[in-house]
Swiss-Prot record:
Molecular-function annotations in GO: bile acid transmembrane transporter activity; identical protein binding
GO biological process annotation, one example: bile acid and bile salt transport
Membrane association type: Lipid-anchor
Protein name: Multidrug resistance protein MdtE
Role of this protein: Part of the tripartite efflux system MdtEF-TolC, which confers resistance to compounds such as rhodamine 6G, erythromycin, doxorubicin, ethidium bromide, TPP, SDS, deoxycholate, crystal violet and benzalkonium.
Location(s), subcellular: Cell inner membrane
SUBUNIT field: Homotrimer. Part of the tripartite efflux system MdtEF-TolC, which is composed of an inner membrane transporter, MdtF, a membrane fusion protein, MdtE, and an outer membrane component, TolC. The complex forms a large protein conduit and can translocate molecules across both the inner and outer membranes.
Keywords: Antibiotic resistance, Cell inner membrane, Cell membrane, Lipoprotein, Membrane, Palmitate, Signal, Transport
Lipidation (N-palmitoyl cysteine): 21
Pfam families in the record: CusB_dom_1, HlyD_D23
InterPro entries given in the database record: CusB-like_dom_1, CusB_D23, MFP_Efflux, RND_pump_MFP
Lipid-anchored residues (S-diacylglycerol cysteine): 21
Position of the signal peptide: 1-20
Amino acid sequence: MNRRRKLLIPLLFCGAMLTACDDKSAENAAAMTPEVGVVTLSPGSVNVLSELPGRTVPYEVAEIRPQVGGIIIKRNFIEGDKVNQGDSLYQIDPAPLQAELNSAKGSLAKALSTASNARITFNRQASLLKTNYVSRQDYDTARTQLNEAEANVTVAKAAVEQATINLQYANVTSPITGVSGKSSVTVGALVTANQADSLVTVQRLDPIYVDLTQSVQDFLRMKEEVASGQIKQVQGSTPVQLNLENGKRYSQTGTLKFSDPTVDETTGSVTLRAIFPNPNGDLLPGMYVTALVDEGSRQNVLLVPQEGVTHNAQGKATALILDKDDVVQLREIEASKAIGDQWVVTSGLQAGDRVIVSGLQRIRPGIKARAISSSQENASTESKQ
């Protein structure tokens, strides 16, 4: 009996040792399983923003030219200042124009007097014709002279009106409200009516236009995707945002105004025009900007962070996923385009897949890994294209 007890004790001790070793091996194996960050894919929609180059264009431009000739005797604005519609910009010497008006008024008075005498003569001839004291020829001559005199009155009145207008044109005014540019003439300069060179340019900059260029390929792609339902366009006006040359986002949001129906043969692009509020004058004509045009919402999209997509030697896109057994699997995928810092995946992955986005250097296909949630799980749904 004692002999059996002596044999049983060592066997129990060995069993306990083996159990402890198994537990320690399991702990070591768990400790050696690499941790990876994963993103669980779910379909959603994203706002597609087309990034288009463009330049700012004044909302209105008025090149000021004189409508009468004469000597500039005064400039009534400060270059670079705001001018209102109707403000006086230049004063042309009115004396010659006033003399022309006075002469026209004198000619009108003379024409009126001649017409009055012709009317009296005609009336007298008409009365005498009834009693046959004058001939029909004398009557006809009197009527013709009256008609000519009345026509001369009409011409003289028109001359007075034109001279009055010319005198008003001596005060050169701004037809729009805007910012004045550099004056091309000084006091004492001789100007002529409708000359080729403008005196000054006035530009309205609030609001302001931005002319954008879009390639025909992108234009056709957008139309196809809208027609197929892949993109749901924004109802009403299309919002547009601007990035300035210094990299900063312009504070005001604009809207798309129109799309040019023709294609520029030299560049193969179409022109889009957006309009922006410019209350502080931050946008100046000719500035280069980058516009973000909201094309609409792309439906049922799988977005994969760029960290989760690599390209093999053949240039094909691949991704590592963690299957239901926590085994790393390699998938060949189709990443149609990058939107911001994410790829739009059209095949090779499906909703619910866990894509590995961090810890990639510690794993390879076929091994087990332990998943941890990635901070990129909730990716932005507004992206550039």
